[in-house]
């Protein structure tokens, strides 16, 4: 039981750290690319319509999810072995920081309940400097029970304020997590898109 508990803590911390680190890396790269251009006409991004969504399917993990056609899908460069795929919002200008949607699966040797994993996540988020915006039961589009938590991590040396939504659901000994990570200032803008992605998520096996 202790080993499983510690494994759960590690998985959650790695997930959060990987997500935040990835966003910081993109921000630094964007800032580094800014050279002699003194100004850039920033175009306000337009949320994709329903017809502009593609389907990502992974038979190995038995999952399926829809994502915007103008977002970048990547299965490489992910920082934790539990990560399956990440999706990044379009860059609108040279200093833009993309929002990130990360899908992961953690496998345990024993069956896990949604309630037990929820207690683990909530305990993990009870850290100094973490602001929990909300934590509530959630139902996926196909009726699968899940849970969601929205929180703001400690800012540290990050040059922007991130806001994170973590949704998790459980099937047998597998925990599936869907993480939305972006600038707090743009969090609400992409929220309808993220909600559609989350609602489209299916466990196919």
Residue locations for each model-derived region?
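Sec-dependent N-terminal signal peptides of Gram-positive bacterial secreted proteins and lipoproteins
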Residues: 2-28
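N-terminal, intrinsically disordered, polar/charged segments of Gram-positive cell-envelope systems
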Residues: 27-52
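N-terminal "mature-domain start" segment
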Residues: 44-81
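Generic structural detector for well-ordered beta-strands
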Residues: 55-57, 64-66, 72, 104, ...
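Extracytoplasmic/secreted envelope proteins and their assembly/folding machinery
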Residues: 68, 84, 118-122, 191-198
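Extracellular/lumenal ectodomain signal focusing on beta-strand-rich modules
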Residues: 70, 134, 148, 199-200
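Surface-exposed amphipathic alpha-helical segments
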Residues: 71-73, 174-205
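Conserved polar/disulfide-associated segments of primarily extracytoplasmic proteins
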Residues: 76-177, 182
């Amino acid at each position: 039981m202790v080993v499983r508990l510690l494994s759960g803590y590690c998985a959650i911390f790695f997930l959060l750290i990987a997500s935040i680190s990835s966003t910081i890396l993109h921000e630094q790269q964007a800032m580094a690319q800014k050279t002699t251009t003194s100004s850039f006409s920033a175009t306000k991004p337009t949320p994709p319509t329903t017809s502009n969504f593609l389907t990502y399917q992974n038979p190995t993990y038995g999952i399926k999810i829809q994502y915007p056609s103008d977002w970048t899908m990547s299965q490489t460069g992910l920082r934790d072995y539990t990560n399956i795929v990440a999706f990044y919002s379009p860059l609108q200008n040279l200093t833009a920081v993309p929002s990130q949607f990360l899908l992961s699966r953690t496998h345990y040797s024993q069956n896990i309940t949604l309630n037990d994993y929820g207690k683990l996540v909530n305990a993990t988020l009870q850290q100094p400097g973490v602001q929990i915006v909300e934590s509530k039961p959630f139902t996926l589009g196909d009726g699968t029970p899940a849970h969601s938590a929205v929180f703001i991590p400690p800012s540290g040396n990050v040059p922007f304020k991130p806001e994170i939504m973590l949704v998790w659901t459980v099937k047998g000994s597998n925990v599936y997590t869907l993480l939305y990570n972006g600038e707090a200032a743009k969090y609400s803008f992409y929220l309808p898109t993220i909600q559609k992605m989350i609602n489209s998520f299916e466990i196919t096996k």
